[in-house]
Regions:
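Short, Lys/Arg-rich N-terminal segment immediately upstream of the first membrane anchor
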Residues: 1-4
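Structural detector for internal amphipathic alpha-helices that build alpha-solenoid repeat scaffolds
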Residues: 22-31, 42-60, 83-119, 127, ...
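Surface-exposed, flexible loop/turn segments at secondary-structure boundaries
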Residues: 76, 203, 278, 310
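Hydrophobic membrane-insertion alpha-helices, especially the h-region
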Residues: 8-23
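Acidic helix-start/capping segments at beta-turn-to-alpha-helix junctions
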Residues: 70-74, 82-86
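Amphipathic alpha-helical scaffolding segments comprising HEAT/armadillo-like alpha-solenoid repeats
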Residues: 34-41, 62-73, 119-130, 152-167, ...
Length: 339
């Protein structure tokens, strides 16, 4: 036991020394309120400190991007991972002498940090889609899609890079690239040949560590591209026979948007109203709203879902349901509003 404890202590000291040297090699960084970008990035994963950290990155602007990329690369370091793993096992006296391990900086932390910079970060994100680091590639693809929330943002310049990212070895990169392309709509028609094969993606992570919904993301993107994605219809129609109701629903909406087919898609959407998670039903409501009077068979179920207990999700869904009813059957919408 003593031998193992001694080995653990020496291992920690060695790791701490390596990491100290690693951090000292970092180039000089911009600062804000006397703190470097890296110091602010340390606070991003910490709920109590993240608000101030995001405000600081917004103030620093594009000059913070190199540090964000560097931090994402460092997050993949086996040294950091091992140090975080071993530190809690140290004797308290020794732990006081060593630096606290840095909180894990995940891809969504990096994506949020990029978004603090705003639309001006787009050229950096496009370039970083080819970065050697998986964390950087996932974060940049995710951030590019989320730029749609910014006034004046236009990610059409990213379409070629995002299309190439559909071939990335990582399912997470493929997922976020497909989502981002969907937000560009018909402008992404050139990506259709690269999106179609993703409808057959295995979606299972290596080692069965979870499922990545690449097929649904690809189907959604093809639907948002619209009639220019007609080449995808044969494969999309085959997905309507899948067991996964969420995939069937997203596919049904996509087919409707590409081909205006109500006959084969509305029954799937009606099934989805009761079978998929409430957090995902908004996609069903949007599809039915687009169908208008042709979705009249769904009116009774839509009206019944207006009466669900009030929660943040149900309140959001109620707005979507009300809009769908107004598009499908204004008279039914008016009656439902009076209840």
């Amino acid at each position: 036991v003593r031998h193992r404890k001694t080995a653990l202590i020496w291992s920690l000291l060695f790791l701490a020394g390596l990491m100290a040297g690693f951090w000292m090699l970092n180039p000089a960084e911009p600062s804000y309120q006397g703190r470097s970008v890296s110091a602010w990035l340390d606070d991003i994963p910490m709920p109590k400190n993240s608000t101030a950290a995001h405000a600081a990155l917004k103030a620093i602007g594009s000059n913070a991007a190199p540090s964000i990329i560097r931090r994402l690369r460092q997050s993949e370091s086996p040294l950091q991972t091992k140090y975080r793993e071993l530190f809690p096992r140290l004797p308290p006296q020794l732990a006081k002498l060593l630096p606290q391990p840095k909180a894990e900086f995940r891809y969504f932390d990096g994506a949020g940090a990029f978004l603090d910079i705003g639309p001006g970060v787009e050229p950096i994100l496009i370039h970083s889609l080819k970065d050697r680091s998986l964390s950087v590639r996932v974060a940049t693809a995710s951030a590019l899609g989320s730029l749609r929330f910014f006034d004046g943002a236009d990610i059409r310049d990213a379409i070629p890079g995002l299309t190439e990212a559909l071939h990335d070895e990582s399912k997470m990169v493929r997922l976020h690239a497909a989502l981002a392309l969907g937000f560009t709509g018909p402008e992404a028609a050139s990506s259709v040949p690269a999106l179609i094969p993703l409808l057959n993606d295995s979606e299972i992570q290596p080692g069965n560590s979870g499922r990545i919904f690449v097929r649904a993301a690809a189907a959604g993107a093809l639907g948002k591209i619209g009639p220019k994605a007609k080449a995808a219809l044969p494969l999309l129609r085959s997905l309507l026979a899948e067991k996964d109701i969420y995939l069937r629903v997203v596919t049904a909406v996509a087919i409707w948007r590409i081909d205006a087919d109500v006959t084969n898609t509305l029954p799937v959407l009606i099934d989805g109203l009761t079978q998929i998670d409430e957090n995902s039903r908004w996609e069903v409501y949007e599809g039915m709203a687009e169908m208008g009077p042709r979705a009249k068979a769904a009116v009774p179920l839509l009206v019944s879902q207006l009466g669900l207990p009030p929660t943040p999700v149900n309140s959001y869904n109620s707005q979507k349901i009300t809009n769908a009813l107004q598009q499908i059957d204004p008279e039914a919408a008016a009656k439902a509003a009076m209840k």
